[in-house]
Amino acid sequence: MNATPASVQAALEPAAPQPATPQPAAPEAEKEVLFRVVNRVAIVTLNRPAALNALSHAMVRELAGLLENVRADDAIVALVLEGAGPKGFCAGGDVRALYQLAREQARDGANGWQQFFVDEYRLDYLLHTFCKPIVALLDGVTMGGGMGLGQAAALRIATSRTKIAMPETRIGLLPDVGATHFLAKMPVEMELYVGLTGAMLTGADAVHCRL
């Protein structure tokens, strides 16, 4: 029998194991909060467009940490809040995730899910008492917790796609995240109507009602 050529024999032999390569960092598409600084202005992007940028607990905590850093950084003079994608700034808290967590913890009598609201309210207070100017781009859906974030801004930009609401009453909750303060800017009849019914307002409505 003829000997197998060296080139063929080498191809048939199992390849030597390759050293493990480090995994690449998560692409920005997988990050729930994006952060960059342009011309001394910090730009924070809520990055869950498939969920209308609804706030997860991890997002709330990350936002709080970023804001503390921005507040302490003298090189940053202003802050911009925006949402990723064309459909919304922020639809509020991730109610589905909270509901699922509450159901799971109810079996053990735990109520750790309530920590989300504690952290969210602290985040809103941090924004509403922020020492640097804030601009909020309220393009698209801006509801519930999204209003809590956006209403902290000295300059709030609404568009023809803006849809504003405090829909908490539809799931048995009260309008929160500072709503008793910012809804009071409207005439009392409108304040009660929006707060009790969860009615949706357009960008033009928001301008007319000083939201």
Q: Which residue stretches match the model-derived regions?
A:
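Conserved CoA-thioester-binding segment of acyl-CoA-metabolizing enzymes
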Residues: 1-17, 21-82, 125
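Hydrophobic/aromatic residues within transmembrane alpha-helices
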Residues: 81, 94, 149-150, 205-206
